[in-house]
C-alpha cells in the first residue's frame, strides 16, 4: 500500500536542511505525485526538481486559484504560464467534489469568474442574491438534512465590543463533538475512536489572522474554555480530554510534521496521564513529549487549512483582517467544505476579499521562458 508523506520526508530534509536526495543521489521512483501543489514554494520546489531522476514522471496536482505558499513563489501558477509546458498542463473542468448546481460549487465558480470591471457593490449584491442564504446564523450545527448550504451573516458593529454571542454561535458546530466525547468518556471500552475523530473532523472554524477578537488565538481560547466547561473537566498542564492540537514545525524525533493534527485522550494504560492520537499517522504520542507551546486547533488559519476537507466550515473575520484578504484566501477557505459554508464576516472586509487578488512575481516564468527557447 502506498503511504503518503510530506515533501520534507520524501526528500529526507532534516534539521540541517540538507536533503538526503538531490541531483547526485536522486529519488528511487518512477512516478512522484505531489498533491496540493499550489503550496509549493520556490526553495522546496527547487529541491524537489533537483531530486527527480531523468526517467521519473513528476505529477503536480493542485489549484492555482488557491493560496500560494507563505514563502517565496507561486510555482504551480507560474508553471502554467510557460508556453513550452502548455501540453503538459491539464485542467479539470468538472468538479468531483460538488456539482455545478451545489451552493459551494456556485460560490467557488462565482469567485473564479469575478470581473475586475464590475462595480464592487454589484458583485456583493450578486453574491447575496445568487449564492448565499442571507440569514442570521441561529445555529450552525451540522444537520443531516442540510447538505448544500452557504450561510451569510454580517458582523454587527454594535455587538463587537462584546463578541461572546458570536463565539457561542461558532461553538455550535462542535456540539456533536462534545456529545461524542461524553459518550467516549462513559463507555471508552465500547466506543469506536473513529467516531470521535469523525465528529471533530466534520467541522472547523477558519480564520484569516492570528490576533484580534476574531483571530486564531482568541477563538481557540474561547473554544477551550467552552469545551472544558461542557465536559466539566479541568486542564492538567494544559491538557484535557478532547483537546485538538496541531504541530507547527517538523519534529523528526517524534516523527511529526508541520500541520499534523491530533486529539488528546486519557492514556490507555495510565489513567492519570494523557496521550495524543494523530489519525493521519495512526500514531499515539504521550502528551508530555509534545512541545508545551503546541497550538490548540479548534480554529485554523485559512493558510494552515490547505489540504484539509471538512463537511462544514465556518469562516470568520472582521475589519482587522482587511490587509491580507483576497480572492485566493476566500476561495481556499470555501473549498475546504464539502457540504456547508457559514460566513460570519465584516461586510466591507468581505467585499474586499471578493475584489482583491494577490500578485506575486518570483521571476520564475521569465527564466523558464528564456531557457525553453
What does each model-found stretch correspond to?
Residues 8, 38-39, 46, 65-66:
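Catalytic acidic motif of RecA-like/P-loop NTPases
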Residues 16-30, 40-56, 200:
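Short basic/glycine-enriched coil/helix segment immediately N-terminal to the Walker B
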Residues 65, 69-245, 251-253:
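Conserved helicase motor core of P-loop NTPases
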Residues 29, 54-57, 85-90, 201, ...:
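Short glycine-/polar-rich loops that comprise or flank the Walker A/P-loop
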Residues 35-36, 62:
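Walker B catalytic acidic pair
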Residues 260-373:
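C-terminal accessory regions
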Residues 1-28, 300:
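Inter-Walker segment of RecA-like/P-loop motor cores
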Residues 53, 238-241, 257, 305, ...:
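Residue-level recognition of short, solvent-exposed, well-ordered loop/turn junctions
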Amino acid at each position: 500500500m502506498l503511504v503518503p508523506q510530506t515533501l520534507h520526508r520524501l526528500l529526507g530534509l532534516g534539521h540541517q536542511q540538507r536533503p538526503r536526495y538531490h541531483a547526485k543521489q536522486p529519488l528511487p521512483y518512477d512516478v512522484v505525485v505531489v498533491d496540493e501543489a499550489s503550496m509549493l514554494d520556490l526553495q522546496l520546489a527547487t529541491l524537489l526538481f533537483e531530486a527527480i531522476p531523468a526517467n521519473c514522471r513528476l505529477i503536480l496536482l493542485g489549484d492555482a486559484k488557491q493560496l500560494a505558499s507563505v514563502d517565496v513563489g507561486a510555482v504551480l501558477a507560474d508553471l502554467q504560464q510557460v508556453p513550452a509546458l502548455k501540453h503538459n498542463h491539464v485542467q479539470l473542468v468538472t468538479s468531483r467534489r460538488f456539482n455545478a448546481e451545489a451552493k459551494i460549487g456556485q460560490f467557488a465558480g462565482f469567485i473564479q469568474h469575478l470581473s475586475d470591471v464590475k462595480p464592487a457593490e454589484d458583485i456583493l449584491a450578486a453574491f447575496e442574491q445568487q449564492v448565499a442564504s442571507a440569514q442570521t446564523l441561529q445555529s450552525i450545527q451540522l444537520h443531516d438534512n442540510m447538505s448544500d448550504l452557504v450561510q451569510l451573516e454580517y458582523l454587527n458593529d454594535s455587538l463587537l465590543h462584546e463578541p461572546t454571542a458570536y463565539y457561542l454561535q461558532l461553538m455550535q458546530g462542535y456540539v456533536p463533538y462534545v456529545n461524542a466525547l461524553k459518550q467516549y468518556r462513559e463507555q471508552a471500552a465500547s466506543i469506536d475512536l473513529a467516531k470521535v475523530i469523525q465528529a471533530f473532523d466534520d467541522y472547523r472554524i477558519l480564520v484569516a489572522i492570528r490576533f484580534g477578537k476574531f483571530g486564531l488565538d482568541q477563538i481557540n481560547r474561547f473554544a477551550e474554555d467552552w469545551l472544558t466547561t461542557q465536559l466539566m473537566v479541568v486542564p492538567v498542564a494544559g491538557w484535557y480530554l478532547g483537546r485538538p492540537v496541531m504541530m507547527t514545525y517538523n519534529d523528526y524525533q517524534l516523527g511529526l510534521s508541520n500541520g499534523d493534527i491530533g486529539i488528546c485522550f486519557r492514556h490507555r494504560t495510565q489513567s492519570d496521564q494523557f496521550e495524543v492520537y494523530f489519525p493521519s499517522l495512526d500514531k499515539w504520542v504521550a502528551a508530555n513529549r509534545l512541545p508545551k507551546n503546541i497550538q490548540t486547533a479548534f480554529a485554523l488559519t485559512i493558510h494552515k487549512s490547505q489540504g484539509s476537507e471538512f463537511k462544514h466550515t465556518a469562516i470568520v473575520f472582521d475589519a482587522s483582517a482587511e490587509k491580507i484578504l483576497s480572492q485566493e484566501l476566500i476561495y481556499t477557505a470555501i473549498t475546504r467544505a464539502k457540504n456547508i459554508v457559514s460566513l460570519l464576516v465584516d461586510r466591507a472586509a468581505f467585499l474586499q476579499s471578493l475584489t482583491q487578488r494577490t500578485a506575486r512575481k518570483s521571476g520564475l516564468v521569465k527564466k523558464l521562458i528564456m531557457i525553453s527557447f
